[in-house]
From Swiss-Prot:
Residues reported in the UniProt entry to bind Fe(2+): 99, 101, 105, 144
GO CC annotations, alphabetized: cytosol; nucleus
GO molecular function: acireductone dioxygenase (Ni2+-requiring) activity; acireductone dioxygenase [iron(II)-requiring] activity; heteropolysaccharide binding; iron ion binding; nickel cation binding
Catalytic activity, as annotated: 1,2-dihydroxy-5-(methylsulfanyl)pent-1-en-3-one + O2 = 4-methylsulfanyl-2-oxobutanoate + formate + 2 H(+); 1,2-dihydroxy-5-(methylsulfanyl)pent-1-en-3-one + O2 = 3-(methylsulfanyl)propanoate + CO + formate + 2 H(+)
Source organism per UniProt: Arabidopsis thaliana
Record keyword Ribosomal protein present: no
Chain sites annotated for binding Ni(2+): 99, 101, 105, 144
Main subcellular location: cytoplasm
Protein name: Acireductone dioxygenase 1
Associated pathway: Amino-acid biosynthesis; L-methionine biosynthesis via salvage pathway; L-methionine from S-methyl-5-thio-alpha-D-ribose 1-phosphate: step 5/6
Lineage top rank: taxon: Eukaryota
GO terms under biological process: L-methionine salvage from methylthioadenosine
Subcellular location: Cytoplasm; Nucleus
Protein backbone atom coordinates (compact mmCIF):
# COMPACT_ATOMS: atom_id res chain seq x y z
CA UNK A 1 0.00 0.00 0.00
CA UNK A 2 1.45 3.37 -1.03
CA UNK A 3 1.83 6.19 1.49
CA UNK A 4 -1.02 8.24 0.00
CA UNK A 5 -3.39 5.26 0.04
CA UNK A 6 -2.32 4.43 3.60
CA UNK A 7 -2.98 8.01 4.73
CA UNK A 8 -6.47 7.90 3.20
CA UNK A 9 -7.18 4.52 4.80
CA UNK A 10 -6.10 5.86 8.21
CA UNK A 11 -8.87 8.46 7.93
CA UNK A 12 -11.47 5.67 8.18
CA UNK A 13 -9.56 2.97 10.10
CA UNK A 14 -7.60 3.92 13.22
CA UNK A 15 -6.12 1.66 15.88
CA UNK A 16 -4.75 2.03 19.40
CA UNK A 17 -3.93 0.01 22.50
CA UNK A 18 -6.83 -0.38 24.93
CA UNK A 19 -6.68 0.82 28.51
CA UNK A 20 -8.41 -2.42 29.66
CA UNK A 21 -10.90 -0.62 31.90
CA UNK A 22 -14.13 -2.53 32.37
CA UNK A 23 -16.49 0.43 31.97
CA UNK A 24 -18.76 0.94 28.94
CA UNK A 25 -17.38 -1.11 26.03
CA UNK A 26 -18.67 1.51 23.56
CA UNK A 27 -16.17 4.15 24.74
CA UNK A 28 -12.80 4.61 22.97
CA UNK A 29 -10.73 3.31 25.93
CA UNK A 30 -7.47 5.04 24.99
CA UNK A 31 -4.47 4.54 27.26
CA UNK A 32 -3.01 7.63 28.94
CA UNK A 33 -0.93 8.71 27.10
CA UNK A 34 -2.53 7.42 23.90
CA UNK A 35 -0.70 4.62 22.06
CA UNK A 36 -1.70 4.43 18.40
CA UNK A 37 -1.07 1.38 16.24
CA UNK A 38 -0.17 1.64 12.55
CA UNK A 39 -1.91 -0.14 9.69
CA UNK A 40 1.44 -1.84 9.04
CA UNK A 41 1.35 -3.34 12.53
CA UNK A 42 -2.20 -4.56 11.92
CA UNK A 43 -0.99 -6.15 8.68
CA UNK A 44 1.70 -8.01 10.67
CA UNK A 45 -1.19 -9.61 12.59
CA UNK A 46 -2.91 -10.53 9.32
CA UNK A 47 -5.49 -7.72 9.50
CA UNK A 48 -5.97 -6.06 6.09
CA UNK A 49 -7.50 -2.61 5.56
CA UNK A 50 -8.80 -0.56 2.64
CA UNK A 51 -10.60 2.74 2.17
CA UNK A 52 -13.39 2.51 -0.40
CA UNK A 53 -16.23 4.68 -1.69
CA UNK A 54 -19.12 3.68 0.57
CA UNK A 55 -21.57 5.99 -1.21
CA UNK A 56 -21.09 4.09 -4.47
CA UNK A 57 -20.44 0.55 -3.25
CA UNK A 58 -22.79 -0.96 -5.85
CA UNK A 59 -20.62 0.28 -8.73
CA UNK A 60 -17.19 0.57 -7.04
CA UNK A 61 -14.56 -1.02 -9.30
CA UNK A 62 -12.04 -1.35 -6.46
CA UNK A 63 -14.52 -3.29 -4.33
CA UNK A 64 -15.26 -5.49 -7.33
CA UNK A 65 -11.55 -6.11 -7.84
CA UNK A 66 -11.01 -7.01 -4.16
CA UNK A 67 -14.00 -9.36 -4.19
CA UNK A 68 -12.81 -11.11 -7.34
CA UNK A 69 -9.17 -11.43 -6.26
CA UNK A 70 -10.07 -12.78 -2.80
CA UNK A 71 -13.02 -14.95 -3.85
CA UNK A 72 -15.72 -13.06 -1.91
CA UNK A 73 -18.68 -14.41 -3.85
CA UNK A 74 -21.44 -13.76 -1.27
CA UNK A 75 -22.50 -10.38 0.12
CA UNK A 76 -25.22 -9.15 2.43
CA UNK A 77 -25.92 -6.02 4.45
CA UNK A 78 -26.64 -5.73 8.16
CA UNK A 79 -27.42 -2.83 10.46
CA UNK A 80 -26.30 -2.99 14.08
CA UNK A 81 -28.60 -0.61 15.95
CA UNK A 82 -31.48 -0.92 18.43
CA UNK A 83 -34.11 -0.17 15.77
CA UNK A 84 -32.95 -2.73 13.18
CA UNK A 85 -31.32 -5.64 15.01
CA UNK A 86 -33.66 -7.94 16.97
CA UNK A 87 -32.48 -8.61 20.55
CA UNK A 88 -30.01 -5.76 20.14
CA UNK A 89 -28.48 -5.70 23.64
CA UNK A 90 -28.11 -9.48 23.70
CA UNK A 91 -26.48 -9.49 20.25
CA UNK A 92 -24.07 -6.68 21.13
CA UNK A 93 -22.98 -8.62 24.23
CA UNK A 94 -22.51 -11.76 22.12
CA UNK A 95 -20.42 -9.90 19.51
CA UNK A 96 -18.19 -8.58 22.33
CA UNK A 97 -17.30 -12.06 23.59
CA UNK A 98 -13.74 -12.85 22.52
CA UNK A 99 -13.95 -15.40 19.72
CA UNK A 100 -12.48 -16.65 16.47
CA UNK A 101 -13.82 -18.01 13.19
CA UNK A 102 -12.51 -20.77 10.96
CA UNK A 103 -12.89 -18.45 7.96
CA UNK A 104 -11.98 -14.82 7.35
CA UNK A 105 -14.28 -12.16 8.74
CA UNK A 106 -14.78 -9.36 6.22
CA UNK A 107 -16.66 -6.17 7.10
CA UNK A 108 -17.15 -3.04 5.03
CA UNK A 109 -18.60 -0.07 6.93
CA UNK A 110 -21.16 1.70 4.75
CA UNK A 111 -22.45 4.05 7.49
CA UNK A 112 -21.82 4.70 11.16
CA UNK A 113 -18.82 3.19 12.94
CA UNK A 114 -17.74 0.51 15.35
CA UNK A 115 -14.82 -1.04 17.21
CA UNK A 116 -13.13 -4.33 16.43
CA UNK A 117 -10.65 -5.46 19.08
CA UNK A 118 -7.79 -7.84 18.21
CA UNK A 119 -4.83 -9.23 20.16
CA UNK A 120 -1.25 -8.28 19.37
CA UNK A 121 1.72 -10.68 19.47
CA UNK A 122 1.85 -10.34 23.27
CA UNK A 123 -1.89 -11.01 23.68
CA UNK A 124 -2.64 -7.34 24.42
CA UNK A 125 -5.83 -5.78 23.06
CA UNK A 126 -5.70 -3.37 20.12
CA UNK A 127 -8.89 -1.42 19.39
CA UNK A 128 -9.59 -0.84 15.67
CA UNK A 129 -12.10 1.92 14.93
CA UNK A 130 -13.75 1.37 11.55
CA UNK A 131 -15.72 4.25 10.08
CA UNK A 132 -17.69 4.80 6.87
CA UNK A 133 -15.61 3.65 3.91
CA UNK A 134 -13.39 1.27 5.88
CA UNK A 135 -13.10 -2.33 4.67
CA UNK A 136 -11.35 -4.67 7.08
CA UNK A 137 -10.43 -8.34 6.81
CA UNK A 138 -9.63 -10.46 9.86
CA UNK A 139 -7.81 -13.72 9.12
CA UNK A 140 -9.25 -17.07 10.12
CA UNK A 141 -8.08 -18.04 13.60
CA UNK A 142 -7.51 -14.55 15.06
CA UNK A 143 -9.18 -13.84 18.40
CA UNK A 144 -11.28 -10.70 18.18
CA UNK A 145 -14.54 -9.06 19.27
CA UNK A 146 -16.84 -6.27 18.08
CA UNK A 147 -18.92 -3.47 19.54
CA UNK A 148 -20.60 -0.42 18.15
CA UNK A 149 -19.25 2.85 19.50
CA UNK A 150 -21.31 5.35 21.53
CA UNK A 151 -23.33 6.31 18.42
CA UNK A 152 -24.94 2.82 18.52
CA UNK A 153 -25.04 2.46 14.75
CA UNK A 154 -23.12 0.65 12.07
CA UNK A 155 -24.32 -0.46 8.66
CA UNK A 156 -21.95 -3.05 7.27
CA UNK A 157 -21.52 -5.19 4.22
CA UNK A 158 -20.60 -8.74 5.15
CA UNK A 159 -18.55 -10.62 2.57
CA UNK A 160 -17.96 -14.36 2.42
CA UNK A 161 -16.21 -16.95 0.31
CA UNK A 162 -19.15 -19.15 -0.64
CA UNK A 163 -22.19 -19.07 1.66
CA UNK A 164 -22.76 -16.84 4.71
CA UNK A 165 -21.28 -19.01 7.45
CA UNK A 166 -20.70 -17.12 10.71
CA UNK A 167 -19.84 -19.48 13.55
CA UNK A 168 -18.09 -17.99 16.57
CA UNK A 169 -15.80 -20.12 18.73
CA UNK A 170 -15.32 -18.35 22.06
CA UNK A 171 -11.86 -18.35 23.59
CA UNK A 172 -10.21 -20.75 24.28
CA UNK A 173 -10.31 -22.73 21.03
CA UNK A 174 -6.58 -23.02 20.38
CA UNK A 175 -7.00 -26.63 19.23
CA UNK A 176 -8.88 -25.68 16.06
CA UNK A 177 -6.87 -26.07 12.82
CA UNK A 178 -7.67 -22.45 11.85
CA UNK A 179 -6.14 -21.20 15.12
CA UNK A 180 -3.06 -23.39 14.73
CA UNK A 181 -2.59 -22.17 11.16
CA UNK A 182 -2.95 -18.54 12.31
CA UNK A 183 -0.43 -19.04 15.10
CA UNK A 184 2.04 -20.72 12.76
CA UNK A 185 1.79 -17.94 10.17
CA UNK A 186 1.55 -14.81 12.34
CA UNK A 187 2.46 -15.60 15.95
CA UNK A 188 5.75 -17.42 15.49
CA UNK A 189 7.43 -15.61 18.35
CA UNK A 190 5.97 -13.94 21.42
CA UNK A 191 8.62 -12.13 23.37
CA UNK A 192 11.64 -14.46 23.45
CA UNK A 193 9.77 -17.74 23.24
CA UNK A 194 8.62 -19.65 20.20
CA UNK A 195 5.04 -20.81 19.95
CA UNK A 196 4.50 -24.49 19.34
CA UNK A 197 1.65 -24.28 16.85
CA UNK A 198 1.56 -28.06 16.51
CA UNK A 199 0.64 -28.64 20.17
Amino acid sequence: MGEAAKDQTEEVIQAWYLDNKEEDQKLPHHKDPKEFVSLDKLAELGVLCWRLDADNYETDEELKRIRESRGYSYMDLCEVCPEKLPNYEEKVKMFFEEHLHIDEEIRYCLAGSGYFDVRDLNDIWIRVWVKKGGLIVFPAGIYHRFTVDSDNYMKAMRLFVGGPVWTAYNRPHDHLPARKAYMKKFLKVIGDRNIDASA
